[in-house]
């Protein structure tokens, strides 16, 4: 039901309008500028045919293939750890002899921790480098998933460490979403995000199956937790090799330079008028 609202009321990004320059692009850009309190521009920067022809499939081009593989792998691996907590906590707690309602209560604390983790992570990104913060968060996610697997059969202790595991694992998801948004250039960002998340969701399917298989083989919970926590560790290692992309100066900075030049010309013209 929100699709019509988005279609009619959410404007296209300035980057996209500058790159593609469809009919009425200048008017739409100036309308956005006015809403943000900026001066209008008189003309759009020149865009080469090669730039206009760039497609969403560029995420598989030689320039972006490494980025696509790294981000997709990191997300897939961390999702494996994240969904172990999300799907297996109630079963694990119930198998310890607690009532189903108590098992559900422990999972609630995982979600509470996750909500807090996402909020705190968002605040910290204002002060700490995004990639470094995400890597550290993934490592702590693995630590607390491992600790949860070794907690005694005590609801309070399990709830505490489950909340901490939820805190860091969900914060890691938030960090990966932010990295995905920065990893791809504007024209391929939507498709790149969809591809990475779609690929990574395979981890949400595989994670419960793998954990169940390990438990069925007779592996004890502490060992299973260690194995499932490895996903976050590997995700953190993979992220170390990522070089975040930035948009070409031909998009954002060129139109900003156009705007500044337009403002300067207006100021000069006003100065001449005053002198006369």
Residue ranges of predicted features:
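Loop-to-transmembrane helix entry/capping segments in MFS-fold secondary transporters
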Residues: 100-101, 186-196
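Intracellular juxtamembrane helix-capping segments at the cytosolic ends
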Residues: 171-184
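Central mid-sequence intracellular linker of multi-pass
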Residues: 1-49, 237-263
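Extracytoplasmic gate region of multi-pass secondary transporters
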Residues: 60-118
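Interfacial helix-cap and linker-helix signal at transmembrane-aqueous boundaries
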Residues: 93-94, 124-125, 211-219
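Structural signature of the two symmetry-related core transmembrane helices
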Residues: 132-146
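A membrane-interface helix-boundary motif in multi-pass transporters
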Residues: 215-230
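Helix-to-loop junctions at the C-terminal end of transmembrane segments
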Residues: 118-129
């Amino acid at each position: 039901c929100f699709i019509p609202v988005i279609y009619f009321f959410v404007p296209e990004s300035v980057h996209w309008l500058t790159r593609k320059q469809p009919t009425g692009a200048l008017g739409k850009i100036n309308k956005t500028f006015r809403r943000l309190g900026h001066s209008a521009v008189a003309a759009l920067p020149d865009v080469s045919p090669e730039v206009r022809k760039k497609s969403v499939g560029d995420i598989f081009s030689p320039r972006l293939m490494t980025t696509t593989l790294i981000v997709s792998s990191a997300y897939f691996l961390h999702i494996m750890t994240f969904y172990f907590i999300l799907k297996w906590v109630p079963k694990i707690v119930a198998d310890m002899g607690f009532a189903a309602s108590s098992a559900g209560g422990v999972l609630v604390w995982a979600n509470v921790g996750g909500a807090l983790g996402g909020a705190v992570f968002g605040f910290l990104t204002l002060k700490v480098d995004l990639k470094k913060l995400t890597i550290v968060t993934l490592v702590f996610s693995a630590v607390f998933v491992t600790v949860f697997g070794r907690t005694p059969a005590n609801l309070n202790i399990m709830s505490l460490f489950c909340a901490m595991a939820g805190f860091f694992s969900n914060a890691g998801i938030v960090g990966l979403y932010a990295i995905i948004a920065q990893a791809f250039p504007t024209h391929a960002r939507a498709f790149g995000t969809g591809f990475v998340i779609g690929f990574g969701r395979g981890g949400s399917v595989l994670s419960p199956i793998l954990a169940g298989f390990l438990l069925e083989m007779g592996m004890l919970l502490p060992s299973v937790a260690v194995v499932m926590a490895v996903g976050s560790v590997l995700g953190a290692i993979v992220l170390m090799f990522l070089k975040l992309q930035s948009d070409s100066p031909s998009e954002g900075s060129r139109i900003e330079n156009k705007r500044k030049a337009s403002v300067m010309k207006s100021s000069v013209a006003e100065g001449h008028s005053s002198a006369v």
